[in-house]
């Protein structure tokens, strides 16, 4: 189940609601149950469910879920199997102590609250094996069919008129060597077809038999004999209601759910897993799959739309017992926390508008349309809206023909403007004409639609004429002019009484048909872009990208735009600079012209240098560098002179050392913009020291010394990592020489200790643990001996250090006495 189910498309079109007023016994007390399945009841009293418990009680649930209870005969044990017929007769199988079985037929039509249902027929027989399944049904209230499947592959069959005691009319037949776990009848009641068929499913194998009177099973058909997978559950899907044309046997295996007809195997649905239950309601197949990946008793309930091949519901239930299916409803029975009852749930379909919205969100337009057709909304505004959205989706995918077909089906519901506005481009001309033609057939044509149809027809004629002419063979100016006129009429087809084409529309036309139109008549088309349609500078760069092969034209057009809009985006200036560089490479402009353009428009130097180097424009790059250097020197000299004069005139005032010259000038300009503000008033922005141009050398030397010390420590740490691989980590404590356990401490110096052997609390220094051996060495070194305090007031501290040294010496002598080398390599990390 885990693999195949994830491959299906999923949309939750159902939900679960609780049916609290139905009281069903706990599953531990139920011995068997049955319901009509797809059998059609013609009686007024419709029975939904029959439950037989282990206390010989028979619970009958009516159509309104009212429950009537009565007991089976006192001489019988608990009922083991039961089956409900289409005329409300209940067939039961009760075993006895002699390995025999009692078969009783109850007439539920005569059941009342005060009087139990009477037994109208009974039989007793000795089966050859344990009964596993039971099915019973009637044909025109004349023939009664009853079949019991046994564990050894045999069947007990009664087929004929029912009598008070029909024990003598029961026949035993052998089907296969595997246990029979399902029996289903398919009775034909048409005058031309009276064939009575019985399907039998075994643990391995599916068979079909023709029934005849006197309990004869004739003409055995082996529908499936696959021994690779076991048959878990099976149901009969009856024809009728206009939803299913032929009756089918539905069998659930571990690999999939298979359907069979008397002619052979039918559809197959790839849902893997052990099948706990099967049901068929309308177009929906309901499958309960046992989840083998969980230790707990969990079952995944899957509802499959067999027509659209999608999963419309999927939910996991704990201890799912069984599923009750009807023509339009499905009920789910699960165990609850209450030991005396079960939970009754109903599988309910969402409202049609919610389901359509969910399908449209996942772009399942075809399924949404079929669902609307199934619900009777074939010609409705809701369906037209879905078709309009479907047409938009197809248009974006490039399927113009199918999109137009969907748009045509919306005529009468969707406003024509909504469709026409999407098909106005030249490449949609044929599809727009088809839509307008269909719209004209169903509606009265207006003058606007007539002119639009004429425009589309004219476009088709011009396109046809252009396709017949090959402009490469034209040498006559008159013919070229004629073809240019056709091109302009086709690509920019605008009636004389309408406004000119907008710039965005012209841009789309150029994207579609630019190469063809430029090849026919370059001047006319480019002039149309420049003078007629380009009224703003926002889209001009899009035209420049399309016309990349026409550098001269683009440069002139950009120059005109920049001249018309002096305060334009800097991006336009750099695009124009790029075009000038391309023309300079072709010797169409001089280097002086390009340099003058750069100086005139004051372009950013960093971007200008990058672009000029890209086009190997080095001579002007050198000029720019020289000009920038001279300008920078003059700028700095001016600032220094200004600061010097300010400090000279105000000796008590000094600048902040972190204040840049540029910031200082900006502050000075904003402060002294009026004559009322004097230099003394801006004193708070200065400090009592002059602006320093160099860093304090003493602080710099101290920083260098600190960084060198940090580098030295890092190198030492790195050396320990590189010289001590993990393979040679110490495995014994350096104090007790016992094997190290999980509670151990490792140091980078290659020493390791037990946690209880190392008194790390006494060696804690600045929140760092120190090795007891290495610390002893450091304390014995001469550089540490001078650190002892000789002050009489610190006697306790001196004694503590001396005692500590003695302890370390004793430890060191003990380690040397063991002749353990201190050079053992180890990894300090566990």
UniProtKB/Swiss-Prot annotation:
Any GO MF annotation of the entry? zinc ion binding
Keyword Transport present in the record's keywords: the answer is yes
Against InterPro entries, the record matches this protein to: Znf_RING, Znf_RING/FYVE/PHD
Gene label: Vps11
Zinc fingers (RING-type) by residue: 733-775
Gene Ontology CC annotation, any one: lysosomal membrane
| Locations listed in the record | Late endosome membrane; Lysosome membrane
**What is the protein's given name?**
Vacuolar protein sorting-associated protein 11 homolog
Q: Which domain of life is it from?
A: Eukaryota
> What follows loss of this gene?
Impaired autophagosome clearance in fat body cells of starved 3rd instar (L3) larvae. Conditional RNAi-mediated knock-down in muscle cells disrupts transverse-tubule (T-tubule) and myofibril remodeling in internal oblique muscles during metamorphosis.
Q: Which CDD domains match?
A: RING-H2_Vps11
Xref: PROSITE patterns: ZF_RING_2
UniProt KW keywords = Autophagy, Endosome, Lysosome, Membrane, Metal-binding, Protein transport, Transport, Zinc, Zinc-finger
Coiled-coil residue windows: none
Q: How does it assemble?
A: Part of the homotypic fusion and vacuole protein sorting (HOPS) complex, composed of Vps16A, car/Vps33A, dor/Vps18, Vps39, Vps11 and lt/Vps41. Unlike in other species, not part of the class C core vacuole/endosome tethering (CORVET) complex.
Its function? Part of the homotypic fusion and vacuole protein sorting (HOPS) tethering complex involved in endo-lysosomal vesicle trafficking and lysosome biogenesis, but unlike in many other species does not form part of the class C core vacuole/endosome tethering (CORVET) complex. The HOPS complex facilitates docking and fusion of lysosomes with late endosomes and several other types of vesicles. The HOPS complex is also involved in autophagy, pigment granule biogenesis and crinophagy (the elimination of unused secretory granules through fusion with lysosomes).
Share an example GO biological-process annotation for this protein. cellular response to starvation
Give the membrane topology. Answer: Peripheral membrane protein
Q: Does the keyword Membrane apply?
A: yes
């Amino acid at each position: 189940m885990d693999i195949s189910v994830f491959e299906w498309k999923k949309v939750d079109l159902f939900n679960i609601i609780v049916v609290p007023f139905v009281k069903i016994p706990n599953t531990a007390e139920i011995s068997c149950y049955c319901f009509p399945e797809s059998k059609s009841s013609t009686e007024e009293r419709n029975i939904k469910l029959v439950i037989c418990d282990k206390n010989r009680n028979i619970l009958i649930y009516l159509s309104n879920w009212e429950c009537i209870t009565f007991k089976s005969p006192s001489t019988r044990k608990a009922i083991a199997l039961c089956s409900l017929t289409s005329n409300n007769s209940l067939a039961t199988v009760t075993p006895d102590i002699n390995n025999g079985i009692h078969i009783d037929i109850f007439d539920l039509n005569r059941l009342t609250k005060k009087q139990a249902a009477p037994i109208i027929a009974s039989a007793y027989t000795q089966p050859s094996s344990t009964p596993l399944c039971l099915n019973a049904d009637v044909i025109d209230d004349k023939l009664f069919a009853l079949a019991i499947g046994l564990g050894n592959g045999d069947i007990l069959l009664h087929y004929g008129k029912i009598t008070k005691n029909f024990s003598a009319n029961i026949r035993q037949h052998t089907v296969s060597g595997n246990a029979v776990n399902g029996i289903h009848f398919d009775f034909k009641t048409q005058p031309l077809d009276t064939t009575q068929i019985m399907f039998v499913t075994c643990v391995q194998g599916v068979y079909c038999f023709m029934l005849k009177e006197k309990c004869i099973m004739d003409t055995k058909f082996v529908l499936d004999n696959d021994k690779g997978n076991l048959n878990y559950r099976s149901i009969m899907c009856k024809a009728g209601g206009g939803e299913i044309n032929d009756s089918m046997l539905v069998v659930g295996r571990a690999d999939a759910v298979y359907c069979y007809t008397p002619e052979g195997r039918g559809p197959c649905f790839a849902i893997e897993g052990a099948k706990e239950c099967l049901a068929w309601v309308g177009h929906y197949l309901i499958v309960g799959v046992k989840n083998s990946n969980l230790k707990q008793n969990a079952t995944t309930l899957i509802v499959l739309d067999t027509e659209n091949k999608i999963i419309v519901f999927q939910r996991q239930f704990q201890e799912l017992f069984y599923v009750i299916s009807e023509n339009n409803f499905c009920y789910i029975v699960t165990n609850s926390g209450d030991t005396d009852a079960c939970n009754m749930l109903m599988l309910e379909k969402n409202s049609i508008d919610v389901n359509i919205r969910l399908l449209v969100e996942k772009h399942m337009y075809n399924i949404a349309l079929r669902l609307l057709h199934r619900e009777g909304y074939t010609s409705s505004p809701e369906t037209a809206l879905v078709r309009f959205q479907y047409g938009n989706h197809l248009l974006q995918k490039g399927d113009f023909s199918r999109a137009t077909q969907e748009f045509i089906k919306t005529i009468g519901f969707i406003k024509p403007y909504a469709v026409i506005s999407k098909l106005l481009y030249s490449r949609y001309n044929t599809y727009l004409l088809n839509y307008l033609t269909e719209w004209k057939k169903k509606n009265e044509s207006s003058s606007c639609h007539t002119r639009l149809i004429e425009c589309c027809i004219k476009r088709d004629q011009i396109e046809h004429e252009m396709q017949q002419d090959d402009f490469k063979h034209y040498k006559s100016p008159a013919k070229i002019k004629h073809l240019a006129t056709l091109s302009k009429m086709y690509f920019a087809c605008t009636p004389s009484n309408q406004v000119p084409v907008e710039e965005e529309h012209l841009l789309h036309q150029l994207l579609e048909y630019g190469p063809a139109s430029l090849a026919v008549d370059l001047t006319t088309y480019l002039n149309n872009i420049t003078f007629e349609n380009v009224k703003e500078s926002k889209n001009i760069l899009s035209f420049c990208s399309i016309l990349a092969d026409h550098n001269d034209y683009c440069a002139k057009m950009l120059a005109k735009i920049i001249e018309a809009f002096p305060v334009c985006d800097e991006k336009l200036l750099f695009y124009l600079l790029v075009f000038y560089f391309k023309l300079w490479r072709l010797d169409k402009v001089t280097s002086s012209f390009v340099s003058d353009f750069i100086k005139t428009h004051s372009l950013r130097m960093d971007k200008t240098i990058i672009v000029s180097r890209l086009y190997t424009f080095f001579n002007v790059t050198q000029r720019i560098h020289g000009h920038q250097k001279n300008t920078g020197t003059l700028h700095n000299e001016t600032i220094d002179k200004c600061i010097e004069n300010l400090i000279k005139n105000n000796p008590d005032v000094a600048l902040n050392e972190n204040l840049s010259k540029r910031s200082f000038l900006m502050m000075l300009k904003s402060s002294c913009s009026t004559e009322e503000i004097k230099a003394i008033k801006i004193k708070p922005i200065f400090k009592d020291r002059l602006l320093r141009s160099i860093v304090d050398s003493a602080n710099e030397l101290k920083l260098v010394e600190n960084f060198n010390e940090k580098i030295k420590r890092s190198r030492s740490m790195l050396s320990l990592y590189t010289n001590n691989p993990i393979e040679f980590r110490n495995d014994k404590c350096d104090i007790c020489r016992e094997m190290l356990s999980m509670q151990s401490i490792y140091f980078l110096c290659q020493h390791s200790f037990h946690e209880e052997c190392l008194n790390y609390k006494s060696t804690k220094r600045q929140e760092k643990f120190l090795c007891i051996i290495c610390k002893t060495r450091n304390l014995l070194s001469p550089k540490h001996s001078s650190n002892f305090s000789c002050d009489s007031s610190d006697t306790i501290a001196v004694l503590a250090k001396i005692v500590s040294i003695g302890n370390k010496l004793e430890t060191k002598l003990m380690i040397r006495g063991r002749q353990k080398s201190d050079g053992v390599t180890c990894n300090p990390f566990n």
